[in-house]
Amino acid sequence: MHHIQTADLRFSADNTPVSDRFDDIYFSTQDGVAESRYVFQQGNALWERWSACQDIHFVIAETGFGTGLNFFAVTTLFRQFRRQNPQSPLSRLHFISFEKYPISAEQLAITYQTFSEFSALAAQLQQWWQINGIPIEGCYRYHFGETTLDIWFGDVNTQLPQLGDYMQNRIDAWFLDGFSPSKNPDMWNETVYRLMYRYTKPQGTFATFTAASAVKKGLESAGFRVEKRAGFGKKRECLYGEKPAENAPHFTASQVNTPWFLPQAAKFDGAADVAIIGGGIASLFSALSLLERGADVTLYCEDDELALNASGNKQGAFYPQLSDDDERNIRFYIHAFAYGLQRLQWAVAHNVPFEHRFCGVALCGYDEKSAAKLDKISAYQWDKKLYAGMNREELAQTVGLPLPCGGGFIPNGGWLAPRQFVQNAFRLLESSGLSVKTAQKITALSSTKNGWTLQNAQGETFRHNIVVLANGHRLHRFEQTARLPLYPVRGQVSQIATGENLLKLNSVICYDGYMTPADEAKTSHCIGASHVRDCENREFSTTEQQENQAKIQKNLAMDWTHDVDTSDNRARVGVRCAVRDRIPMMGNVPDFDRQTEEYRNLFNLRRRKQPVLVAANFENLYLVGALGSRGLTSAPILGECLASLIYGEPLPLSEDIIHALCPNRSWMRKLLKGTPVK
């Protein structure tokens, strides 16, 4: 995990931002906005191409986010285009940018004091940077209405490859910005140019402010057709060009580095007709992201009400999983947490009523093993907005009650009422066109020429083009998902009465369990949860109730824990869906029989460097599952990632994380080693 260094930025006498690190200005001192419009918008002929575009989204990629001027300018242009062309099929703009040294939220605010036309957009981005910071490298997704911004923080040489096989032939236009090639040579290199070519659509374009001969030769060597035109202001010339259609290699499996993990977009015409099977938080965020893209979405819930299973607790903790031996899993949860904060703020802004407090989450080093894990976490130089290590006195002062140990604190974490949130958010989505069908137990799926037929327990059938399975521990009950290595985990959460001491708790505390602060009525707390693998029984357990009380009194052996009393037997039992490697599943539903047959000799094919087929999946069938005990944190980014995949848009996670989420990953680990899968 690499942490992000911020920019060495100062403002000149005329308020132009200047980089001390690169000894260069961020944009023209003559007119930065005019320069952006001339070099990048006109250089890529954006308005003309948008007017002729028959696709529903257009993808721009940029090297060097800087102050965000190019993004704000093109977002403003796209909004103007949409107002003037409301009937155009092009309804969404996707902007990808790379930045190694981001400016701070405060510097962003100063920069846009002189650009009033972009002040609202800049203020929105500034708000997210102030709340969340930029804790680690990787992709951070932000929504600006019809425009989506993905900023990949880190070195472009390491981040650009993480767009991966999936992004081959998907980018429409490039803004080659960043500082002068002579002052920032690490960014202007043949590896970047080759990846640009790979990711660019046939007849996709690029534009840049420079006319340096090394840049021109590098782009031509990669395969682009390069032209010169008059430069902006004092610059004599600048470059623009395209990826020739006649030279563009056909997309074949042999060009894909990891075809067994290649995500596959849905096939549909017109509006996507999507069925979601489920009724909890994974279904909610999948539905939200699909509706935002204009999909027709129908939800089929087995229960009589929504959020009756794992999403049905009175209070649940919201924070990233940091104590994992797999560094990739930690990165996933940090990015999921950052995106989840945005989605919860979206709910607040849309007046979704739900109890919540962003009161922070304390991680307690209650024994030798947990303390060692927290020491390992603290060894990273985290952004303080994400995590801060604390000694016993500091942690106790932060949470409001005495503690026997130190640990760490996640200031933007907190708690929310999952059932209340999910049910009320679904009501909001219904007003936006979501169709909800409860008491619909879907028992079978069958593929048809135009999509899928769903059959319920009464024998009724429903037809949809695309199906998303998000039904928790019931996910593997279909013929198509029966071989997935999922298992149920029963969890009992105890609800306890508050008291004078317990009311002092002002943050969620985690030990070998967790306890929330009092609810908004100041009457009760939640503690939990039990963990019983391979159990779907939802009956109340006196033993588990007593264990929940015993754990906090053992792990945090302070006088106030004696006020924790579960004897009134108030509790709720849910069943979670889990998987052994502790990271969710998201993506295409794999065809087990075909994949194990076609990849049975994969080990030797790779050793001999022979072509390998793209993975055989069930067309237009997707899943989100195995969220375990971190569904509140992971569901928002998983739902967004799934919707992006269905629509063939850029994905908000790095390729290595996408691979880790692939539902066929456990089979592929064996097949890649030459081990048979049974």
From Swiss-Prot:
EC number: 2.1.1.61, 1.5.-.-
Family annotation (Gene3D superfamilies): D-Amino Acid Oxidase, subunit A, domain 2 (3.30.9.10), FAD/NAD(P)-binding domain (3.50.50.60), Vaccinia Virus protein VP39 (3.40.50.150)
Protein biosynthesis as UniProt keyword: no
Species assigned in the record: Actinobacillus succinogenes (strain ATCC 55618 / DSM 22257 / CCUG 43843 / 130Z)
Residue stretches in coiled coil: none
Region of interest (FAD-dependent cmnm(5)s(2)U34 oxidoreductase), ranges: 277-678
Cofactor: FAD
Membership in a protein family: In the N-terminal section; belongs to the methyltransferase superfamily. tRNA (mnm(5)s(2)U34)-methyltransferase family.
Location of the region described as tRNA (mnm(5)s(2)U34)-methyltransferase in the Swiss-Prot/TrEMBL record: 1-244
Gene field: mnmC
UniProt-recorded name of the protein: tRNA 5-methylaminomethyl-2-thiouridine biosynthesis bifunctional protein MnmC
Reactions the enzyme catalyzes: 5-aminomethyl-2-thiouridine(34) in tRNA + S-adenosyl-L-methionine = 5-methylaminomethyl-2-thiouridine(34) in tRNA + S-adenosyl-L-homocysteine + H(+)
Role, per record: Catalyzes the last two steps in the biosynthesis of 5-methylaminomethyl-2-thiouridine (mnm(5)s(2)U) at the wobble position (U34) in tRNA. Catalyzes the FAD-dependent demodification of cmnm(5)s(2)U34 to nm(5)s(2)U34, followed by the transfer of a methyl group from S-adenosyl-L-methionine to nm(5)s(2)U34, to form mnm(5)s(2)U34.
